[in-house]
């Protein structure tokens, strides 16, 4: 086993144990309310800290905020990772999956605002459906030869709206 594999194994074990960490459970309880809809199998719903909408448990994640848990790149990082991962409720918030993906993209690109990350995420999702993109570009009079040109043209079209 290489050092990288060992550290990945340690990180995985620590993350799986953190799912039962009491402050994490408390954060979920603080963001929940009884569900009053038609689904008899759903008991609670959880409020996203960003969009303020309500979601079922499978559609939310517990996010470390404002300080992320980080990663383990060398053995010396384990202590700091544990301190960040096993934190108190005030360093945790509940986010819907979509907002968490957008927030993660924003964190990976310093200087990018949340709205820019939301736009980028929408653009990435659109670019995956090539037929839809080509039809949209053709409707707007664009004839693009590659993905880079399609992406630039699509960005122009969407920013005009």
What are these regions (language model features)?
Residues 1-52, 81-90:
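Short, charged surface segments at domain edges that flank catalytic/cofactor-binding sites
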Residues 89-161:
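A detector for short metal-coordination/catalytic motifs
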Residues 53-91, 107-110:
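Histidine-centered nuclease catalytic patch
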Residues 47, 61, 95:
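The −1 position to Zn-ligating cysteines in a subset of zinc-ribbon hairpins
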């Amino acid at each position: 086993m290489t050092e990288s594999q060992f550290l990945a194994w340690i990180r995985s074990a620590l993350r799986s144990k953190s799912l039962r960490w009491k402050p994490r459970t408390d954060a979920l309880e603080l963001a929940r309310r009884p569900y009053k809809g038609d689904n008899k199998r759903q008991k609670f719903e959880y409020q996203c800290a960003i969009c303020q909408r309500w979601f079922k448990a499978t559609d939310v994640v517990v996010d470390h905020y404002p300080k992320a848990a980080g990663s383990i790149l060398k053995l010396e990082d384990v202590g700091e990772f544990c301190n960040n991962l096993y934190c108190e409720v005030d360093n945790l918030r509940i986010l819907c999956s979509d907002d968490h993906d957008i927030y993660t993209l924003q964190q990976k690109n310093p200087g990018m605002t949340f709205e820019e990350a939301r736009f980028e995420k929408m653009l990435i999702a659109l670019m995956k459906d090539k037929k839809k993109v080509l039809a949209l570009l053709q409707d707007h009079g664009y004839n693009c030869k590659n993905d880079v040109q399609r992406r630039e043209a699509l960005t122009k079209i969407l920013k005009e709206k």
